[in-house]
């Protein structure tokens, strides 16, 4: 699903970015064609402080956190109802060089495929290396994404490391993934810190 709608910023004045225990999520609207620097910095600050963010990608909305924050990783695993060490989360990276920080050296053919396909709506399952966070050390492979979405890429660039991510599932039997950010906010506002549209 391509998201080319015009976006603006709406901030919830009751939200406190640093005290993440007493919160109702903030709903941020950001222009994909020109992501607002102030809004992106707020998202990065929340991620660095252990927050969870729902954000648009080039496919469906993702639920993500900073790869270096164990408590945030545990929160996502709890929300998804899985043990962290058994969770199959993707690493959202900013570009191919970022990917190489977390995977073993790949052959030329695989590199050419990645270069041609990314950024794009694909998750590549690749062999992980020794730089994986301790929570993922037992995994031999990791899912790697570089979404074709300026908001997601700018968040990862400014954060300086990948976002651990999973898709937002809908309980509706007909519609498996939610694509309406206002409905997502309504459902997730007490579980996450920011919902971005």
Kindly give the residue locations of the regions a language model identified.
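Short, basic, low-complexity termini and linkers enriched in Ser/Thr/Gly/Pro
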Residues: 1-22
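Active-site-adjacent structural elements in enzyme catalytic cores
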Residues: 23-197
